[in-house]
A protein has these predicted regions:
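Membrane-embedded helix-loop-helix hairpins and adjacent transmembrane boundary segments
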Residues: 1-405
Length: 405
């Protein structure tokens, strides 16, 4: 089953189609970005071409996803998670022990350069950056709301994550899994931010010309794999390489499984062959995994050419997740029947509105945007507001055009 069947039962087939389409587009782009990020690390560590690393990861993930299905995805991801976590912890302690002043020097450098600064605010609570500033992505409201909305989208509207909850044999187990996810999300994020801060401090103490070159070229994604390759001892290097491989596999296998199941249930079974055998269903699912793995590899090859794959991934989420959040909120929080066709139109216009307000370049529409935003003191709406704007637009307009049940 998929979560988009709920939209079909709640509103109608077109809303289900829109949810399916938005998910598949978002997941192909976002997972392509993830694949590119992992492949960059492997290409640096093993000194192989980026495209070769992308193909290698895609092939391996395809093989065990095809053979094992969602069960293989969940168990391998669990093992890979602990491996990745161990790699991050080991990296932190290695860097601290390698610095002449140890942890104290790391903390001093991090504090001096603002690496531990959570909020970019002034001492005055009335300062606009403390809460609301549409120009600044570091404003408090932008950060808090972006985090909340993104978490809701990932855990509530994305089949990639929801499929794991759907494997639970009881609702309470699924709810417990969500609570554990929420509880662990913050400390794990802090851990990996700590690794980034530790790398920054390490290269302040031990400058490296190659790292300076990565920074100058805005290729900061290459710094950590360069550190693994040139600084770590052989044993630790092996552990971190295994952790990188774990990250690469876990970022791709669940996406392939989600895309395959969504394609079969929401598209193939409805429009191509409604009546089919279980053997045929398995065959189609496996063929679709091959196709999606190839598409993800192509997307990753294009994403690998960008300056920073991390920010590209965040930007992609913002454009489409807002529309998905909005339509699911109408379905869950209101007693409105909804307008099936109107939902599709509103979701599409949500993406257009977000692009108009947040895109770096919108061609001839640039002047119109300036005319609208300049009186409000806004030059260009920060990318962190994109998912929020999309959600509010879809929910607000959707409620207006819906009827009570």
């Amino acid at each position: 089953t998929t979560i988009y069947e709920f939209l079909g039962k709640r509103f109608g087939p077109r809303s289900r189609d829109a949810g399916t389409g938005f998910f598949m587009l978002t997941r192909l782009l976002a997972s392509g970005v993830r694949l590119a990020g992992c492949a960059i690390a492997l290409s640096v560590v093993f000194d192989i071409p980026l495209n070769s690393a992308i193909v290698l990861i895609a092939v391996v993930a395809f093989i065990y996803t095809t053979l094992g299905g969602i069960k293989a995805v969940i168990w391998t991801d669990a093992l890979q998670f602990f491996l990745l976590l161990s790699g991050a912890i080991v990296t932190l302690f290695f860097i601290w022990s390698s610095m002449p002043g140890g942890f104290g020097e790391f903390f001093q450098i991090g504090s001096e350069f603002g690496k531990f600064k959570i909020f970019h605010v002034s001492a005055s609570l009335s300062h606009p950056e403390f809460f609301l500033n549409f120009n600044n992505p570091n404003a408090l409201a932008a950060g808090l709301l972006f985090g909340c909305f993104t978490t809701f989208a990932v855990l509530g509207t994305d089949q990639d994550l929801v499929q794991r909850m759907l494997t639970c044999d009881h609702v309470k187990k699924g709810q417990r899994a969500l609570l554990w996810t929420a509880a662990l999300n913050f400390p794990i994020t802090l851990l990996f931010l700590g690794v980034g801060a530790a790398l920054f401090a390490y290269y302040k103490v031990a400058p490296d010309a190659a790292v300076d070159g990565f920074i100058a070229a805005h290729h900061t994604d290459y710094i950590f794999p360069h550190f693994i390759k040139t600084v770590l001892t052989p044993g630790l290097r092996g552990l971190l390489i295994a952790a990188l491989l774990a990250a690469a596999m876990s970022s791709l296998d669940s996406a392939l499984n989600a895309l395959s199941s969504t394609f079969y249930i929401d598209i193939y079974k409805r429009y191509i062959r409604p009546e089919t055998t279980e053997k045929h269903a398995v065959t189609i699912s496996r063929y679709s995994v091959i196709i999606f793995a190839a598409v993800l590899a192509i997307v990753a090859m294009q994403c690998g050419k960008t300056e920073s794959v991390l920010w590209l991934g965040f930007t992609i989420f913002g454009y489409t997740y807002g529309a998905m959040i909005g339509v699911f909120l109408i379905a869950v929080l209101t007693d409105r029947r909804g307008n099936d066709i109107a939902n599709v139109v509103i979701m599409v216009t949500s993406v257009l509105v977000v692009l108009f307000l947040t895109a770096d370049s919108i061609g001839p529409l640039q002047g119109i945007r300036s005319t609208i935003l300049s009186p409000l003191g806004i030059e260009q709406v920060s990318w962190k507001w994109s998912i929020i704007i999309g959600s509010v637009w879809t929910f607000g307009i959707g409620v207006i055009f819906s009827e009570r049940k």
